[in-house]
Amino acid sequence: MEFPEHSRHLLQCLSEQRHQGFLCDCTVLVGDAHFRAHRAVLASCSMYFHLFYKDQLDKRDIVHLNSDIVTAPAFALLLEFMYEGKLQFKDLPIEDVLAAASYLHMYDIVKVCKKKLKEKATTEADSTKKEEDASSCSDKIECLSDGSSHMAGDLPSDEDDVEEEKINILPGKTDLATESGNMWIRLPSDSASIPQTGGEAETHTAAAGKTADSPCSSTGSLSHRSATSMRDSADVDCVLDLSVKSSLSGAETLNNSYLSSQEILRNSLVQVKVEKEASCDENDIDTTEYDIERNTVKESSSSNIRAPYEPVHLAPIREDSVLRELDHDDKASDDDITPENERVQMETNMDSSLLPYVPNILSPAGQIFMCPLCNKVFPSPHILQIHLSTHFREQEGIRSKPANDVHVPTCSLCGKTFSCMYTLKRHERTHSGEKPFTCTQCGKSFQYSHNLSRHAVVHTREKPHACKWCERRFTQSGDLYRHIRKFHCELVNSLSVKSETLGLPAVRDWTLEDSSQELWK
């Protein structure tokens, strides 16, 4: 005949005895807290206590638990579970209960705590996602409201329209001829120094048009005030003439070229890009490949799209190349704008007269970006770095062997080289099998001194490697590793989950400080 309620009645009686202190044969210390209990109950519910009492049962009246891992409230909760079979977290953190259960090897409690932590993490992730969605919606609404409020402010006035009509007049062939045929170019800055392909140029032009038409765009009509300010900043925007020199005097040519270029600059943009040089001549001739790309702009508002480009002044190049470029551009302005007409490539060599203008080519600070190997000049350090890589790419490959008069420690058997004779001697032991380090206690020999030091612990009976979970000590780090794998694997994994959830240091960083680093190799 079975009595189903017998087990429950037994637990109830044991719980009453524990509260009364009747027949309690052990005391568990967690920090300053004392817990009276029965050894049989503790050993039946916890593998930690089972192993603790297995060896010396009569000498283990007091049990000390690591208060850094097990807290007093968490152990009190687990102790109630042992005697009553009920687990009530109350207001305790689940992480503390998980750490205590892992320390005591109560794996059923560990599984429950892990499940609750996963549910908690999922709930927090869902709530965070909802908050982010709500905030993104509110940001979109604010953006739309700001765009509608700035709509009226972005509309140009009547005077601006008149100025815009004056500025948007494109010069014809006669204008280009009478105005010394000056062309104004802009070199790309560091952030835009990578050459664009044809498809990218089309996309950039289309994007510029959309930006100019959008109500939220920061580009507006070019007023008379902005033109005046551009003339005042002549000391910053250093310019050079790209065209054929006319019969005017030096001062008149400079003034006319500067004024005429201001009008051309508002309507056209020639982007000069420096391509990578693959080789260098023996005579150190300064040569640089340029891709000149000219985009005809219909509206003046798009003249501010490429603000990052700085206007620079280049030395004169060959007459026939410039004339062909001007004629080609004039013909393209009469036809519809197509990708073929928008991109015009011209490859020329820089004249040696560029070198006197080096301080004006580059940044306003006067920095010189010149290749130290071939003396070529570049507009930015980024392009210079790309050019230098072409030199070093040619030198890649097998390292040249040192001169014959330089002695390098080399193994005579396998030909391997070393930095010093000490490492060579250690390497030679792998071929000869020599074991110069001998233990004075047992006569065992080793190839390396650190192996002898590790072996000496066997004779001294020292146990420097301590387990953080059960405070057992071991002579070798490998024994400690096998012990953790066998008895504390669940605890290590659970604390790994805990550290990832709470953003704590990894288990390897704070649980095994006293053990050897070879444990985790």
UniProtKB/Swiss-Prot annotation:
InterPro entries for the chain: BTB/POZ_dom, SKP1/BTB/POZ_sf, Znf_C2H2_sf, Znf_C2H2_type
Domain BTB residue range list: 24-91
GO cellular component, one term: nucleus
SMART domains given in the database record: BTB, ZnF_C2H2
Keyword vocabulary terms for this entry: DNA-binding, Metal-binding, Nucleus, Repeat, Repressor, Transcription, Transcription regulation, Zinc, Zinc-finger
Cited Pfam families: BTB, zf-C2H2, zf-C2H2_4
Residues covered by region (Disordered): 190-230
Annotated compartments: Nucleus
Composition bias, Polar residues: 214-230
Residue ranges covered by zinc fingers (C2H2-type): 369-391, 409-431, 437-459, 465-488
Signal sequence region: none
Biased composition (Low complexity): 197-212
GO MF terms, alphabetically ordered: DNA binding; zinc ion binding
Family statement drawn from the similarity comment of this UniProt entry: Belongs to the krueppel C2H2-type zinc-finger protein family. ZBTB18 subfamily.
PANTHER family assigned: ZINC FINGER AND BTB DOMAIN-CONTAINING PROTEIN 18, ZINC FINGER PROTEIN
Job description of the protein: Transcriptional repressor that plays a role in various developmental processes. Specifically binds the consensus DNA sequence 5'-[AC]ACATCTG[GT][AC]-3' which contains the E box core, and acts by recruiting chromatin remodeling multiprotein complexes.
Protein name, UniProt field: Zinc finger and BTB domain-containing protein 18
Gene name of the encoded protein: zbtb18
